Amino acid sequence: MTSGRAGWHSGPMDALRGRWRADCASVAAHATAETVDEIGIDLLRRWHEPHRHYHDATHLTEVLAAVDALCAVEGVNGSNHAVAALATWFHDAVYAVDPLADNEAESATLAAQQLGRLPVDPDLAARVVAVVLDTASHDLTQQASSDPARVVVHDADLWVLSAPVARFDEYCAQVREEYAHVPVARYAAARTEVLRPFLVRDHVYRTTHARAEWEPSARENLAREITRLAG
């Protein structure tokens, strides 16, 4: 991505640029255009870092689309939709391929800082931060499950597990590329530890729509990938 404001105005970024501005306008109508764009430039720079192969702008776009789809069918609107969208922007904004990194905590801190600059209502910003932190475990407590935004982002972030076979396989290859420095056997064991818990749960997803429409494909994809890793 071209750095600075030139990249912000490049053709491929038009849709994301417009989406960021719209998401900000829904919760911070009095934010200055300069501040909105400064934060947006920083976010897009992060999402285009060269070490990202899966956790990149394509992932951001896919999760935003999944958030919108789930909000539409589940009747999640207003501030709940806004929280889900903003959390999506920040949920992998900090991404380091390092076992000692605390990406979600650092992303949540970034969200709190940047939303405070707009500014966004503190209670709404706190909800965004909570959703970002949820993505560390890809699971929700009973209390978190009562928040529609947290449920939507939980499922949207896991949409790729249910993707068509070609996209799911591409996702698996992209994650492997991010961890190319890890030996094959060690990676296979660690990756299996990440994926297997989704299969042993009663449900991969939390929303009614995702359970009905995404879950069967997700379980097929997960089982196939775990078998491949075992080979």
Regions found by a protein language model. Give the residues of each.
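Divalent metal-dependent phosphate-bond-processing catalytic cores, especially two-metal-ion Mg2+/Mn2+ enzymes
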Residues: 2-27, 48-54, 66-78, 90, ...
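Activation segment
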Residues: 97-98, 162
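Short, flexible active-site-proximal loops enriched in glycine and acidic residues
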Residues: 75-83, 100-103, 120-124
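Amphipathic, well-packed alpha-helical segments that form the structural scaffold of globular domains
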Residues: 44, 64-68, 112
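An active-site-proximal "capping" alpha-helix that borders the catalytic cofactor pocket
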Residues: 63, 102-118
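Short, well-structured alpha-helical segments
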Residues: 36-44, 57, 81-85, 125-133
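Phosphate/oxyanion-binding active-site loops and adjacent basic polyanion-contact surfaces
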Residues: 55-60, 103
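His-Asp-centered metal-binding catalytic motifs of divalent-metal-dependent phosphohydrolases/nucleases
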Residues: 63, 81-97, 107, 129-136
